[in-house]
């Protein structure tokens, strides 16, 4: 599974949550067709300091689609789940946000998640 990771900037153009989710759904479908193993979603953290609307909407949608995702704030070599992701998709090691605790990103594996949401 050492194919490139696709990055999707959902903040581009400052869409509302509904438009961002439409783009997300289309991009996930396209990435799956291309055999892309994982995606990095850039949705921002929001100006309120509590997590933005895009971040919340994206993570809710990913749960509803039963996709396995890893919040950017957990994307660290010190996180056991993140280490499993790095083993499955070695290209993720090249991501500039590894160990950055970036709450404005979410990583997605493009397969249905296992029972309990873990790999």
Model-flagged regions — what are they?
Residues 1-119:
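Long, charged, low-complexity intrinsically disordered regions
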């Amino acid at each position: 599974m050492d194919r490139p990771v696709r990055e999707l900037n959902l903040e581009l153009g400052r869409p509302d949550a509904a438009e961002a989710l439409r783009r997300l759904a289309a991009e996930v479908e396209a990435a799956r067709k291309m055999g892309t193993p994982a995606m990095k979603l850039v949705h921002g953290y929001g100006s309120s300091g509590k997590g933005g609307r895009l971040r919340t909407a994206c993570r809710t949608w990913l749960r509803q689609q039963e996709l396995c995702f890893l919040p950017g704030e957990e994307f660290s070599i010190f996180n056991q789940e993140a280490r499993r992701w790095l083993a499955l998709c070695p290209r993720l090691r090249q991501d500039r946000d590894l160990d950055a605790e970036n709450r404005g990103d979410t990583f997605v594996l493009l397969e249905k998640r296992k029972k309990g949401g873990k790999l």
